[in-house]
């Protein structure tokens, strides 16, 4: 049996142990839907095996142990390949690209507003998302946010506020092979216009009630609504999972 502690109206949660701490009533629903269905547990197990294998390959000095950890990594890749239909070699290659202690990847997303509408970019598959992507190793959150908007929409922006840090597993579907921390940044447009590039087909400004088909693994309607709320609140407090 798991227990949750309702924090609204609570002076302090110190020394009170619970499986979940709920900051507001809406968190009850969020926590309920966090629970995994049995059919999806194989991906969790595969990711955990990859994590164990990666740490073992990185820190083990015994050649026989390293060989065993490499086999665990192969097993994780076999599980993902069998569960998704993806080519085994491709999956194993993605796993082998990881170096050092494995941590979540950072995905920055810019919320850019103009005249009450939000900027979205159209991916090559026709769906739309907030401009953004993986944070490069040599970039800060600020710099990566600016870079991604420029590359995907041709617009220079000025980041002004951190909206939220979200766990991809709790907010977006389908699940990703790696754990992702999504960083949403409120930005002001400076100048520029769309220019042809290899990542996106076009960009556009959309009202909250006129959203196009979204790439849900990158951007959901709820995340866009969150960005609208942040843009309209000068005293917005950063949200985080």
Kindly label every feature range from the protein language model.
Residues 5-7, 22:
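Leucine-biased recognition of intrinsically disordered, low-complexity hydrophobic segments
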Residues 135-159, 167-227, 236-240:
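Unchanged
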Residues 92-129, 157, 161:
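N-terminal strand-loop-strand
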Residues 15, 20-24:
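Low-complexity, intrinsically disordered or signal/transmembrane-proximal segments
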Residues 63-66, 70-109:
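Acidic, metal-coordinating catalytic segment for phosphate/diphosphate chemistry
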Residues 33-60, 66-69, 198-241:
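Nudix hydrolase/Nudix homology domain
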